[in-house]
UniProtKB/Swiss-Prot annotation:
Residues 1-43, 449-474, 755-795, 1389-1406 have a biased composition (Low complexity). Residues 1-59, 449-490, 750-799, 1389-1420 are annotated as: Disordered. The keyword Transcription regulation applies. Belongs to the Mediator complex subunit 14 family. Component of the Mediator complex, a coactivator involved in the regulated transcription of nearly all RNA polymerase II-dependent genes. Mediator functions as a bridge to convey information from gene-specific regulatory proteins to the basal RNA polymerase II transcription machinery. Mediator is recruited to promoters by direct interactions with regulatory proteins and serves as a scaffold for the assembly of a functional preinitiation complex with RNA polymerase II and the general transcription factors. GO terms for molecular function: transcription coregulator activity. Pfam families: Med14 (PF08638). The keyword Thylakoid does not apply. It comes from Dictyostelium discoideum. GO terms for cellular component: core mediator complex; mediator complex. The gene is med14. Residues 1-43, 1382-1412 form a coiled coil. This is Putative mediator of RNA polymerase II transcription subunit 14.
Length: 1420
């Protein structure tokens, strides 16, 4: 125990020591802050040393520590928020995720609090660390001073370099000034001066003579034949050799015996494809061109035939350079994409052999750069570049191929090995593609001749001309031989639009040919398929194999077909047929997607052993090949899937259509085949025959008959097939549904439908007796057809034709009719046939009413029968015409339940209509009160007219389809009893409307008057939002005012009602929140003159009120309630500063303080009244008349609705002022309510709030500080281009009436309303506009003492202020933006400075004038 006590004492001592240390630290921090503030005031800016060299004490940095309590608070708050997040998110996660999240949260929280514990233990050393940090900061600051001093010294050194005087050229300046010239110019400058230029006539004559000499020398000399015609001009001879070189020559003398001199030599050794690029690509010899020119010049001087010598040398140089360039391009060629399929071999005769289209798996044994190895030039595809015996570069190709248009296709002029290779590949590819083209056209000719053999037998003498000539007269293939023939096409191969087209690869590579020749060849064979699709067959330029390019995605079988075509090109016809088949299936697939249907190539289908063998056999035949697609057809309320299978015959490309009925296996995605139907008919065969397949390849893609394009025709065909399938599926689904619901039905024939239509037309013209006879006849037919119902119910599954009958007839039994509605038997019976048909995505149900109900319009004068409904209204789903009903429902909806709901609606509306008509016949008063009655099948409309036209109400009764309940609608005003009226009708088993109808009539005028209170056209003494309407029963309404007072209204008749205080109702125990209305009985009996009714409680709380006086009476009651509420609010505000003089009274109250006696009361149960008198009768400031004017001013303000509570609060705050100060404010109020001041209206704002809660009042008084806080408002009602109308600005000020001073009131600053000694919160910065206002207030406040002295105390400081502030208000109104306000302030400052300067100047001038006058007078 002793040890425990010692430990406790030690802990207490440690805690005391820690507290003392903390107090010392706080004191040190405060001292440091004070020192910092003093040093900041004395220290120069930016931490620089003072200019006078005096050293100041360094700035001690502020304490950058964070409070430990703040750290603990933040850590606990973060942990708590994380825990809240876990509670919200973990219930949605699984068990493993919840456990993981909880463990992560616990680990993280534990780690944070461990760190916090370490931080708490370490916090004991914070003072030492803070001192160390301060020392480091001081040392860093001193170090920065030293560095800045050193930098300034270095900069000074650099700036003094140029601070020296220049050396002046004195001798030159003396010469120029004395003699006017410079005599020291050197004599050698004459050598640099050029001689005078020749004249143009001399130059022209010299050039003409030189041209004549050169022409004569060429005439007598031998010229090589390779030269182009030589041109002579400007003393030069221009020599040009195609694709080799050009040279400019002249002579070195003035006679024909002079030697030739080469002026320039340009070799054309570059690629022509670079002409439009950077220009000619020079060879490696360009660097030694000067050396070459010297050698050639020496050779032609010593030669007897200098021009031949020039040509031989330069020609050999060009040929060698060209071969060297081609050889150098071999390495670049190996870096291209063709590097694995080409080999280049250099021969001993300087030839270059390029082998291309080599297989990638070819074994190159012994092949090097200079040996062929196992490559054989006579077997493998290659071309060879060599120099012939005439010293010309030639190109040969194996196998031998020639261009169909250009014999000299291979030219070395391009000087590009890659271009030559591409030309060879292009020509070889054209030859291979042309072979396929010939095979297809030969097969087409054979098919045409065999198909037209019967027609040509009669014309044996006439021989048919061939469609295509493989070779022309020159033995070259004809490029124009791919035109389509006009002969009839074979059914098995009818899409023969074949053409050769250019490949973008080769045309882009060689787009810049010389001389603009276009020698490109078509290397793509395009075969048109169905629709807009096509098949392109080309040759792979890398390996020389055929490649298939598709316009659709057929990757799964394209590779296999390419292999077949490369093995045997004769397979081209079968390959094209495969693509034709797939393209036709693609057309149907795109058409199904266009129609919004899903398309499948495979479906998980399992054959059902219970089905017949024919269905299984037909399904196996359909799915044996891949020439089919499955289109999914889904209908609403159908769980079993339906598929439309479109299959194409490979021999004739004719589509066939089958409809599959499937069933889903339980808990599986596999389906079983229920049945299968082949859709075929004469109409379908006709559509297939009209298919425009023969003209798909035309440019406009239309047939000769003017039909649409092929794809749109396929879409139309598929749409009709899907429509027929939907009709079949709908027929079967309706049959199964009716069978499931045990509803008798039968499917009528086409003749029965026509007979029924004729009978319906006859029924519309006959009377009711004929209608009954026709119904009996129809019933006999129904009974006969029902006997065959079970036999014919499933015939649709086995019928191979498309069903044309799209209707079913069914009949309800008695139990089903009673289940829908007990009133439905008045419309249909168990013998009434109901026909359902489907078309265009809608179900249409029609029947003839058993006993037609008369729908009428009952007006004031006559009644009009209505024979038809819904024909002109697209929003309604029914049509009624003389007893015949037609209902229309979408297939996606639950049509049967919707139909039953509509039948129930018709029966209920008929029942209510009958009750309403019976009430009007029984009670004569209803005929007067209910007018313009319209009875419709789905609703009832009438006008309730009780009093004047202002209370006319349109009432609509209808049945809501979702809840099957009767609803009411009132226009133009809603009835407060709507909920109880609907409840009363729907709770009645027979939908009795007696009580509801009586309540509607009795509450008609009252509901209109109540709506006028809630949404008035003009504002009154109370706000509409302060009134709450609560229905209590079918004949009682409660009106609440601010949840304090309540008025109960009980309906008695359409002429009288009873109103009472809700506080004294029978359920008063539940209304503990309500307050009794004081002296309501006196108000009702004296002000309204109503007599009280008997009440079980013995209080006079209920009065009988005529409805004609309802609106006026209720409005007076709420005005009285508003006055009571205002009086209660004023009493609460008076309690802190005033003492009550008499006991509390709800209608009046009197208070007093040291200066005044204030009484609040309600005058004549209407208006709120204020009365103020001096407590000291001897005090005449302010006088009773002035106090009366003060009360009258505030009465007017209180009557305004806006900020009424703040107005009362401001009035009470004014009454706390001393009498003399209040007298000043009264004088100001009287003064500002007079005329306008320069177009401005001034008032003390009583209805302005602030953001801060303590400063929300616009006027309040703090007696301890002798200060009044209020706002001066300046309003401008003028209309100009600069000032908008009704603009105002507020100037918040603080008036110290003891010091007679005024300063600006910052309403955003919470410290402005408290003493400066207790202000601890930081001050909030003002906006630019408020800063300008503050400066204006300070400027005007400085003028008040002088103005007070000048007025000798007759004017108050407030009156002086608002008058003096007017010049400052004008620029604020005209320039309301912050930037312009600053400019105005600067301008005013400049104007003041200018005025001061002018005054000083005037004073100086006056002094000088006075001195001058005194001096002149003394002289005189």
């Amino acid at each position: 125990m002793d040890q425990n006590q010692q430990q406790q004492q030690q802990q207490q001592q440690q805690q005391q020591q820690q507290q003392q240390q903390q107090q010392q630290q706080q004191q040190q921090q405060q001292q440091q802050q004070q020192q910092q503030q003093q040093q900041q005031q004395q220290q120069p800016p930016n931490g620089m040393m003072p200019m006078n060299g005096e050293q100041t004490t360094p700035i001690i940095p502020q304490n950058r520590n964070i409070s430990l309590s703040l750290v603990i608070h933040r850590l606990v708050e973060q942990s708590y928020n994380s825990l809240l997040g876990l509670t919200e998110g973990l219930p949605k996660a699984n068990d493993l995720e919840r456990k993981k999240a909880i463990v992560d949260y616990l680990d993280g929280t534990r780690e944070k609090f461990l760190r916090l514990m370490v931080l708490i233990k370490w916090s004991e050393h914070v003072p030492t660390l803070t001192k160390a940090n301060n020392i480091i900061d001081i040392l860093n600051l001193e170090d920065s001073y030293l560095r800045e001093a050193a930098d300034l010294l270095i900069n000074t050194q650099f700036s003094l370099v140029n601070a020296r005087a220049p050396i002046y050229d004195v001798p030159t300046a003396i010469d120029v000034l004395t003699t006017g010239t410079y005599q020291r110019m050197p004599t050698n400058i004459k050598r640099v001066i050029p001689p005078p230029p020749l004249k143009p006539t001399q130059i022209e004559s010299a050039l003409e003579r030189l041209n004549d000499i050169i022409k004569y020398k060429l005439f007598i000399s031998d010229v090589p034949k390779e030269f182009q015609p030589i041109t002579v001009s400007d003393g030069k001879a221009h020599i040009f050799v195609d694709d080799e070189y050009e040279a400019y020559l002249t002579i070195d003398g003035g006679s024909e015996k002079s030697n030739w001199v080469i002026l320039s030599l340009n070799l054309f050794v570059y690629s022509k494809r670079n002409l439009n690029g950077e220009g000619p690509i020079k060879v490696a010899y360009d660097n030694k061109m000067k050396y070459v020119l010297d050698r050639v010049q020496n050779r032609i001087i010593s030669s007897a035939q200098p021009l031949f010598e020039l040509h031989n040398i330069v020609h050999y140089l060009c040929i060698s350079s060209q071969m060297d360039i081609l050889a150098s391009q071999v390495e670049n060629l190996k870096k291209t994409i063709l590097k694995n399929n080409i080999r280049c071999v250099f021969g001993k005769d300087q030839s270059i052999t390029v082998f291309y289209w080599l297989p990638e798996d070819f074994n190159l044994v012994g092949v090097t750069q200079h040996t062929l190895g196992n490559l054989m030039p006579n077997k493998h595809t290659n071309f060879k570049i060599y120099i012939d015996e005439h010293q010309k570069i030639k190109i040969s190709h194996y196998p031998p191929i020639t261009h169909p248009k250009n014999e000299n296709y291979f030219k070395i002029a391009s000087l590009n090995l890659e271009t030559i290779l591409l030309q060879a590949i292009e020509l070889n590819a054209y030859d291979k593609v042309y072979l396929l083209n010939s095979l297809l056209l030969d097969n087409r000719i054979t098919a045409n001749t065999t198909s037209s053999s019967s027609s040509s037998s009669s014309n044996n003498n006439n021989t048919a001309s061939p469609i295509i000539n493989r070779n022309n007269n020159n033995g070259k293939p004809n490029l124009l031989s791919t035109k389509q023939s006009n002969n009839p096409l074979s059914r098995s191969f009818h899409l023969n639009d074949i053409k050769l087209i250019m490949s973008s690869r080769f045309s882009d590579e060689n787009q810049n040919d010389s001389n603009g020749n276009n020698d490109h060849l078509p290397t793509v064979l395009r075969v048109m398929l169905y629709g807009s699709k096509f098949l392109d067959i080309t040759v792979n330029f890398q390996n020389g194999k055929f490649s298939l390019i598709k316009s659709s995605n057929y990757i799964e079988f394209t590779n296999h077909l390419e292999q077949r075509l490369n093995k045997d090109p004769n397979e081209i016809e079968s390959i094209v047929n495969v693509f034709k088949l797939k393209s036709l299936l693609t057309c149907f697939e795109e058409a199904s997607l266009f129609l919004g249907l899903e398309c499948f190539n495979k479906i998980p289908l399992q054959m059902n052993s219970s089905n017949n063998s024919e269905s299984n056999q037909l399904a196996n035949e359909l799915f044996s090949d891949s020439n089919f697609i499955c289109v999914s057809i889904s209908l609403a309320k159908e769980n079993n899937p339906y598929y439309l299978v479109i299959s194409i015959k490979a021999t004739c490309f004719t589509p066939s259509f089958h409809l599959l009925f499937c069933k889903m296996l339980p808990k599986s995605t596999i389906m079983t085949l229920d049945s299968i139907i082949k859709l075929e008919s004469d109409q379908l065969n006709k559509l297939l025959k009209e298919c425009p397949i023969g003209s798909i390849s035309s440019s406009n893609n239309t047939n000769s008959n003017g039909n649409g394009p092929f794809q749109s025709y396929i879409s139309t065909l598929l749409e009709k097939i899907v429509e027929a399938s939907n009709q079949k599926i709908n027929l079967l689904s309706i049959q199964s549904f009716l069978k499931k619901e045990n509803i008798n039905y039968y499917q009528p024939s086409q003749q029965d439908i026509e007979n029924n239509n004729n009978n319906n037309n006859n029924n519309n013209n006959n009377n009711n007796n004929n209608n009954n006879n026709n119904n009996n006849n129809n019933n006999n037919n129904n009974n006969n057809n029902n006997n065959n119902n079970n036999n014919n119910g499933n015939n649709g599954y086995k019928n191979n034709g498309i069903t044309t009958t799209t209707s079913i007839v069914f009949l309800f039994n008695e139990q089903q009719i009673q289940k829908i509605s007990p009133f439905l038997s008045n419309h249909i019976s168990h013998q009434t046939p109901i026909t359902i048909s489907f078309k265009n995505g809608f179900y249409t149900l029609s029947f003839t009413q058993q006993r037609p109900f008369e729908y009428k319009k009952y007006g004031s004068g006559s009644n009009i029968n209505i024979n038809s409904f819904g024909e002109n209204n697209s929003n309604e789903n029914y049509i009624y015409r003389k007893g015949n009903w037609i209902f229309k429902y979408q297939q996606t909806s639950d049509w049967f339940n919707s139909f039953c709901n509509d039948l129930m609606t018709i029966s209920k509306i008929t029942n209510i209509s009958s009750q309403l008509l019976k009430q009007m016949e029984t009670l004569e008063i209803y005929k007067q009160l209910i007018t313009h009655l319209t009875i419709k099948p789905m609703s009832i409309e009438f006008v309730c007219f009780v009093g004047s036209n202002q209370t006319r109400t349109n009432v609509i009764m209808f049945v809501e389809k979702k809840t099957a309940e009767i609803k009411l609608s009132f226009q133009p005003y809603s009835n407060p009893l709507l909920v109880y009226l609907e409840k009363d009708i729907n709770q009645s088993p027979t939908n009795d409307i007696t009580n509801s109808l009586r309540a509607i009539i009795n509450s008609n005028d009252i509901s209109v008057y109540i709506n006028s209170l809630i949404s008035p056209l003009e504002l009154s003494f109370y706000l509409p939002l302060e009134i709450l309407v609560i229905p209590r029963s079918i004949c009682q309404i409660r009106l609440l005012y601010k949840n304090l007072y309540g008025i109960d209204i009980k309906l008695i008749s359409h002429e009288y009602c009873a109103i009472s205080d809700s506080f004294y109702s029978l359920n008063s125990s539940k209304q503990v929140r309500l307050t009794s209305i004081n002296q309501l009985h006196s108000f009702m009996e004296q002000r309204v003159s109503l007599q009280a009714l008997d009440n079980p409680t013995g209080h006079r709380t209920s009065w009988l009120l005529p409805i004609k006086q309802f609106q006026k009476t209720i409005s007076r009651i709420f005005i009285y309630l508003n006055s009571l509420n205002t009086l209660k609010f004023a009493q609460n505000l008076m309690k802190p500063n005033f003492q009550p003089l008499v006991p509390s009274n709800p209608s009046s109250q009197k208070f007093s303080n040291d200066y005044f006696i204030v009484s609040f009361s309600i005058r004549d149960y209407t208006s709120f009244d204020i009365d103020v008198t001096n407590k000291n009768l001897e005090n005449s400031v302010p006088s009773n008349e002035e106090l009366a004017l003060f009360c009258q001013y505030f009465k007017k303000k209180v009557q305004q609705l806006n900020y009424r509570s703040q107005t009362i609060g401001s009035c009470i705050q004014m009454l706390t002022l001393p009498p003399k100060i209040l007298w000043e404010f009264i004088r100001v109020l009287l003064e500002i309510t007079g005329p306008k001041f320069d177009g401005y209206t001034i008032e003390i704002s009583l209805n302005t709030s602030s953001i801060h809660s303590k400063n929300k009042e616009s006027f309040f008084h703090i007696p301890d500080e002798n200060q009044v806080y209020f706002i001066l408002r300046y309003l401008n009602s003028s209309r100009t281009d600069i000032i908008p109308p009704d603009q105002f600005t507020d100037i918040p000020i603080i008036y110290n009436y003891n010091e007679k001073s005024i300063r600006y009131w910052n309403k955003l600053d919470s410290n402005s309303t408290s003493s400066s000694s207790s202000s601890t919160l930081p001050k909030k910065s003002l906006s630019i506009v408020e800063e300008v206002k503050q400066k204006f207030v300070e400027e005007v406040a400085k003028l008040i003492p002088d103005a007070l002295n000048a007025s000798s105390g007759k004017s108050s400081p407030i009156s002086i202020f608002f008058k003096s502030f007017l010049p400052k208000i004008k620029p604020i109104f005209s320039n309301p933006t912050a930037s312009t306000l600053l400019l105005i302030q600067q301008q005013q400052q400049q104007q003041q400075q200018q005025q001061q300067q002018q005054q000083q100047q005037q004073q100086q001038q006056q002094i000088e004038n006075n001195n001058f006058a005194s001096a002149s007078s003394s002289i005189r």
